[in-house]
UniProtKB/Swiss-Prot annotation:
The lineage of its organism: Eukaryota, Metazoa, Chordata, Craniata, Vertebrata. It catalyses: a 1,2-diacyl-sn-glycero-3-phosphocholine + H2O = a 1-acyl-sn-glycero-3-phosphocholine + a fatty acid + H(+). Gene3D superfamilies: Phospholipase A2 domain. This is Basic phospholipase A2 DsM-b1/DsM-b1'. Ca(2+) binds at residues 43, 45, 47, 64. Disulfide bonds join 42-131, 44-60, 59-111, 65-138, 66-104, 73-97, 91-102. GO terms for cellular component: extracellular region. It comes from Daboia siamensis.
Length: 138
């Protein structure tokens, strides 16, 4: 399974906190849940456009919007500190950028965990053809 993880990270191009985001997702679901979201709907994975397909995809849309708000912080590259207190993910950074990016990832991981029942395998590796609509505003 470790080899699969390494291969997947190479294929999608690991950047700074992507591994951290994956661990937060796994903390709110079962191990290796992150793989389900590598290319899902119109927003889970790299980039995004169109209308989110379901609540799961909307979590990724909101995450993209959150990253857009902290753009000056290089959200895909910044590494942050986090921990767990009474079963909850807690961002442990005093640096504004690190804390903001951690919060984006924390909220998205919680959202994905709360909406796992909306996950539709039919939206995995969805063609961009189905995401051609004008994107919603953040």
């Amino acid at each position: 399974m470790r080899t699969l993880w390494i291969v997947a990270m190479c294929l999608i191009g690991v950047e700074g906190n992507l591994f951290q985001f994956a661990r937060l997702i796994d903390a709110k679901q079962e191990a290796f849940s992150f793989f389900k979201y590598i290319s899902y709907g119109c927003y889970c994975g790299w980039g995004g456009q169109g209308t989110p397909k379901d609540a799961t995809d909307r979590c990724c849309f909101v995450h993209d919007c959150c990253y857009a708000r902290v753009k000056g912080c290089n959200p895909k590259l910044v590494e942050y500190s986090y921990g767990y207190r009474t079963g909850k993910i807690v961002c442990e950074n005093y640096n504004r950028c690190k804390r903001a990016v951690c919060e984006c990832d924390r909220v998205a991981a919680i959202c994905l965990g709360q909406n796992v029942n909306t996950y539709n395998k039919g939206y995995m590796f969805l063609s961009s053809y189905y995401c051609r609509q004008k994107s919603e505003q953040c």
